[in-house]
Amino acid sequence: IGTTVPALAGEYFLVTGSGKYFRNVSIKPEDSICMIELDDKGENYRIVWGLVNGGRPTSELPSHLMNLEVKKLQDPDYRVVYHAHTTNIIALTFVLPLEDKVFTRELWEMATECPVVFPDGVGVVPWMVPGGREIAVATSELMKKYDLAIWAHHGTFAAGKDFDLTFGLMHTVEKSAEILVKMLSMQPNKRQTITPDDS
């Protein structure tokens, strides 16, 4: 699997296949996703169901597993890691400084629910080649502090206790990013905003 995750040894995971389209998951799940089981050391996997026409789990498997291990060691109720190519977040990585504090503040200002949904903020990983160990390590370091990490020019990783919370976190961050993108396209400077004293 490209990494070692002993805290996840022997566990099962449902993951998408590499190169598979998410829209096909509901149409042909047996060809688009798979259930994997990790060995007793957390170093290898075997496919126990799915990918019936061949294939491999997502190329981001090391990142998914390392992130989940970090979160589960903090709180055993964490069980979902979700990765998506969030369009507006990606756009912002081309114009905002790639700093946790800057992204957090800008996203918090766009919608009042943001400080409630992600009170610890968001982390930002600078551009790295996806699918490798380096980006997995960088992301898992951020997951020690945040539930959401942004990959510059690529997408977002979110972690949570169930699918609804995890998808909701990512959706809230992406919605806030969409508001910011629209605001920046109309006027680069805010005329009024939510200040830290207001929240």
Language-model segment annotations:
Residues 1-199:
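Glycine-rich flexible loops
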